[in-house]
């Protein structure tokens, strides 16, 4: 059940060890922690968290982001939910979808996908319903471009699921009434600790909505499944085989629809793909490092998120352990990348980050520093500049702009 709760005040922040950040977060705040809403300059931004006793989170948080000056209001708890580690918005309606990354939803060995309605004025979320993800540990969710289906990837279960969306935003079950809405991956790869079996780590619809692309870390494949959002079905189609032990994790299409990128968790690389939209096929054409040359001790390092700048000129990826954002310039004709460097996030464990729709700002989630770091993006070079305004959020692991 969802409900609004008091904002992150000094007493709760003291439990997180974040009181020193409160002053920079509460800029022009209103009751409930939201900035005055100017539709031309501010928008809602949601934060998914890992939940538990402090300093962990309690669910999904919401704030307002001002794209004019790059300020973020004090976050408010928008909905209580267990481990809402990834979020996705409906493309046209006020609905948000979240995974509950657990292995015991409704007394079964699966996680769940949750549908929530958005109050446009406050950002508060009301739960509509939830459905089984069909596997344990769902860690990624997306919505097809038509807004007719939700897609989720199960890390523990090593599978992918498609759930139809009702007109009121609620989710239809996949497994009971529509077995064609579920795919179980199979196989393993060379890393015995992390690749003993399939581990779906992301799922993204193609720009035309005909395919769903799944990075499976456990089998070193980027799988392209045929998608029929109207029927709520997915089916195996093609697959790109990655370097053994690379561990593809997250994926992003370029705005030109001809190129795409994966970030590979285990070997700290980014791979560039040519994408044949008609055939639904990916071809790897370039792979390069996410960290600067000369770093020999990479113990404890792994990558996490990848995103393409709205202009298509730059690509960014996050490094955990190194705790930085890798920056790349894009060659327009080929989609290939040139490494620009890695900017420290001034926090720990950037599991996720997001670029605001204006393309002027990047927000990085420090999972283990319990805060969000704000960066200005140089529109000519793509380089990041830290604004000096970290904002406290408990155990943030996903950032989504509305």
Predicted feature locations:
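A short beta-strand motif characteristic of beta-propeller blades
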Residues: 74-79, 127-131, 189-193, 236-241, ...
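Short glycine/acidic-enriched loop and turn motifs that connect beta-strands
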Residues: 51-54, 102-106, 157-158, 219-220, ...
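N-terminal secretory signal peptides and thylakoid transit peptides that target proteins
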Residues: 2-24
């Amino acid at each position: 059940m969802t409900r609004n709760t008091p904002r992150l005040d000094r007493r709760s922040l003291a439990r997180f060890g974040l009181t020193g950040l409160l002053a920079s977060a509460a800029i022009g705040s209103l009751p409930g922690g939201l900035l005055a809403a100017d539709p031309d300059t501010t928008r809602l931004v949601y934060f998914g968290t890992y939940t538990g006793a402090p300093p962990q989170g309690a669910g999904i948080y919401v704030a307002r982001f001002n794209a004019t000056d790059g300020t973020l209001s004090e976050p408010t708890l928008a909905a209580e939910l267990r481990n809402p580690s990834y979020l996705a918005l409906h493309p046209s309606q006020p609905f948000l979808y979240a995974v509950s990354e657990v292995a015991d939803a409704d007394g079964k060995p699966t996680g769940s996908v949750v549908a929530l309605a958005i109050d446009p004025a406050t950002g508060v979320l009301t739960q509509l319903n939830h459905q089984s993800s069909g596997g344990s540990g769902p860690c990624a969710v997306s919505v097809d471009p038509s807004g007719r289906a939700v897609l989720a990837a199960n890390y523990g279960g090593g599978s992918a699921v498609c759930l139809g969306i009702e007109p009121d935003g609620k989710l239809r079950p996949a497994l009971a009434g529509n077995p064609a809405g579920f795919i179980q991956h199979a196989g393993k790869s060379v890393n015995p600790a992390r690749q003993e079996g399939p581990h779906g780590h992301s799922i993204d619809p193609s720009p035309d909505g005909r395919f769903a692309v799944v990075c499976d870390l456990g089998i070193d494949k980027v799988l392209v499944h045929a998608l029929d959002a109207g029927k709520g079905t997915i089916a195996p189609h093609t697959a790109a085989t990655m370097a053994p032990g690379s561990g593809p994790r997250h994926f992003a299409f370029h705005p030109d629809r001809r190129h795409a990128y994966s970030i590979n968790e285990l070997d700290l690389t980014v791979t560039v793909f040519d994408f044949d939209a008609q055939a639904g096929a990916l071809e790897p054409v370039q792979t390069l490092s996410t960290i600067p040359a000369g770093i020999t001790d990479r113990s404890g390092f792994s990558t996490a998120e990848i995103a393409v700048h709205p202009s298509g000129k730059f690509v960014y990826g996050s490094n955990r352990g190194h705790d930085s954002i890798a920056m790349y310039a894009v060659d327009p004709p080929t989609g290939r990348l040139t490494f620009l460097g890695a900017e420290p996030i001034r926090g720990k464990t950037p599991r996720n980050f997001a670029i605001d729709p204006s393309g002027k700002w990047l927000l990085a989630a420090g999972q283990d520093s319990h805060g969000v770091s704000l960066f200005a993006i140089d529109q000519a070079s793509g380089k990041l500049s830290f604004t000096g305004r970290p904002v406290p959020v408990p155990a943030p692991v996903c950032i989504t702009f509305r």
